[in-house]
Each structure stands twice: as C-alpha cells, then as structure tokens.
A protein has these predicted regions:
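Loop-to-transmembrane alpha-helix entry segments
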Residues: 61, 65, 97, 113-133, ...
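Membrane-interface interhelical linkers
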Residues: 1-13, 41-69, 82, 110, ...
Length: 288
C-alpha cells in the first residue's frame, strides 16, 4: 500500500504542474492535449515493448471496454480543463476540476461497495470548505460562465475516468496506463481532426515544453497514477487527490504570478489538512 501511495502522490504533483507547462505552449488547448497524449502514449508503448511484457488485455474484453471508456473520458477532461485554464486561470480551473473526486466519493458505496465512513465525510467537508475559501476571492470566474462550465464538465469527465478505470480488474500497471493514454490520444485526434483540417504549426521554442508535458508529466505521470489507483481505496484516491489542485494553485502563484489572497491561503490549509487527517486516521485504524 505504501509504495502505491507514494506513486500516487508523485503522479499528483506532476499533474499539478501541467497548467504551468501548458501555459508556455502557444497552441490551442485541444492541440496541446493531442501532442501531450501522443508523446506520452508513445513513451509508454516503447517502455512496454522494451520491458518484454506479455500483452494480456486481449484476454479481458470487459477490462478493455472499461479502460477505453476511461481513456476517452480522460482525453475529454483534459481538453475541457486546458480551455478552462485559459478562461478562468490555472489555479481556479484546477480546483473546480477536482470536484470530480467528490462525485467519485458519493458514488463509491453504490459502484464499489466501499463503506462511506464518518471520518471520510468529515474530511471531505473540510476539503470542500477549503475550495470555497479559495474560490471566494477568485476574480477570474466572475463574468465568465463559459469557463466555469468547462471546468465543471472536466470534473464530471474526471469522475468517469476514475470510476471506469477502477472497474478494470485484470489489466493493471503499465499496460493499463498505455492503453488509457493511447485511447486519450485517439479521442483528442478525432476532435482536432473534426474541428480543423490545418496542419499543426509549432514554434521551435515550444518543443521543449511539449516534450516535458508529454513524456514526463503525461507518460511518467500516467504510469505512476494508473499503476497505483487500482490498489488504493476509491475514497483515499478522492481525498488525497486534492493535493494536485493544491500544488497547481501554489505553482500558479509562484510561477505564473496569479494572485494569492489570505482566503486562498486559508483554503489551501483546509484542503491539505482534510486530506492528511483522512489518511492519518485510516492508518491508525488499520494499523498500517
């Protein structure tokens, strides 16, 4: 459990820096996602081949279906989120995106028969209060309903992604991440192809950030993420998942110079405090 927990946290920190790296690329959000998923899936395919692992997903059609739905949802969520970055800012969009775990938490007793404990519910209330504090001073969302809707839709797609990936029982780890990311690439490719017939023009200065976003943040990040969430409780994934938007907010302040008000700082404390409390209580209760 500890190894998977560490991998999950590292993945969240990488994902938290996505908005910062993407802000350096002078392309439309959907094209950034297309290039990101292409580079990331290509890396995972190469690693899978070099590791000489056997292909197993063809034996489990139900798992293939669940991973495909999860991958399509991930591609859609990223395209929606990246557009929201532009309209309402990286920090605010990231926090709204992470309403997704709340949806997952509420559905977990029905979909996965996981017990919804009082501590988990209490921790979520603390986390949600933190989000309210952070959004209370966000000037970017005022008068920009479109950006808010995009971020909200990305949260719904996030929930779909986690739920269907959790349903994959046999296909795990690198193979799972490889398929998931490749389907995300296909989703972005179909969208971009239907939207425009133009060849993507990339400035020479953008290549470094595209490769970082695709190979490190996406390829490595997705491997760490999808190789760990299958072994973690859904409610743990949901609660600790708020470390990603927290890191995104902090990076947006220090790197992009987005405004951090006292209410934002208080909100960040609530978010981190709620996540840490839930995990400390779980470890004490289980003795792990």
């Amino acid at each position: 459990m500890a190894k998977n927990y560490i991998k999950y946290i590292l993945a969240l920190l990488l994902f938290g820096s996505n908005g910062i790296v993407a802000s350096k690329i002078a392309l439309e959000s959907s094209k950034i996602v297309l290039l990101r998923t292409f580079a990331g899936s290509l890396l995972l395919i190469v690693v899978f081949i070099l590791s000489k692992r056997k292909i197993s997903f063809l034996q489990f059609k139900k798992d293939c279906f669940n991973i495909a739905i999860s991958g399509a949802a991930m591609g859609a969520s990223w395209m929606l989120l990246y557009e929201a970055y532009i309209q309402i800012g990286v920090g605010t969009a990231s926090l709204m995106y992470y309403c997704g775990p709340v949806i997952v938490m509420l559905l977990s007793p029905i979909l996965f028969r996981e017990k919804l404990t009082g501590i988990k519910i209490g921790s979520f209330f603390v986390v949600l209060v933190g989000i309210l504090f952070i959004n209370s001073g966000a000037e970017e969302i005022r008068g920009n309903a479109g950006g808010v809707v995009l971020a909200g839709m990305s949260a719904v797609m996030y929930a779909v992604m986690v739920i269907f990936n959790k349903k994959s029982v046999h296909v795990k780890g690198l193979e799972n991440a490889m398929i998931q990311l490749f389907v995300s690439f296909l989703t972005a490719a179909v969208y971009v192809g239907c939207k425009t017939n133009e060849v993507i023009q990339i400035n020479s200065g953008d290549w470094v950030y595209i490769l970082i976003l695709g190979l490190v943040n996406t390829g490595l990040g997705c491997y760490l993420y999808f190789s760990s969430i299958g072994a973690l409780p859904v409610q743990t994934i949901a609660v600790c998942g708020y470390l990603e938007p927290l890191s995104a907010v902090l990076l947006s302040v220090f790197v992009l110079k987005e405004t951090l008000l006292p209410m934002h700082i208080l909100g960040a404390v609530f978010i981190l405090g709620g996540a840490v409390f839930a995990e400390i209580f779980r470890h004490r209760k289980t003795g792990t």
